[in-house]
């Protein structure tokens, strides 16, 4: 749990720092530096011999997370023709969905059969492959919209980016208020066995992949705002259905799939909305979105846990989850 917290702290700390002090470099060089930090962080974690090294490894690994997706979205907005940017960002975000579907089960297998060190060593090696791909295939472009340090904050005078930050935070909090307790929810309320959880996690991982792809497809027909609002509505309804029909296995699986699909269907449209409403401070805006996303995860898990602390059964975590998602909508 502490290692997860160190990673999350790295995300929150690193995103704005990288956004503010990277305007003098090209976007390609920023991406290369961020991936190098990933390699270093995972290498430190892999070969650590003390708790301090473990903590430093996770902190360094989390540091580039938020900025990487922010810079990546800006690069795509500059090289993809208008009207296709949301779909392109959805393609970038699909990396996270594939990680949930394939990477986590495979990493768990390596940890159980060999050692957790092999999992993080593989991640470091994969980061090197990403580094190579960026070096050869990403064009060397600059974000000419970046002004002085003070000018990068000007977009925050408008309420629009704050509303998008709030929507990102509450939307993620809503899903994670329930998803953080998916195992006991499925086992103790829906009646699944512990051995079924691998299948269930792969199913919701597939939902994340398909939700992200669907969002990208719809971006050619609808605005990012409309996609985000409708997706939040679908998440609210699916969370309410999870509360009322949690005792039925088929219903639980169906609405869990829909809920997780909705979570990643939100990612690309919200990222594009931030870029559209953060003129002059796109890097800072995108980084702020990642902070809101991670803060939402923590708030959601706390809200779900509060219901359990008050003595309610596991399916009651879906109620604050639905309320948080409704706030996002």
Segments and roles (model prediction):
Residues 15-26, 211-224, 308-309:
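Helix-to-loop junctions at the C-terminal end of transmembrane segments
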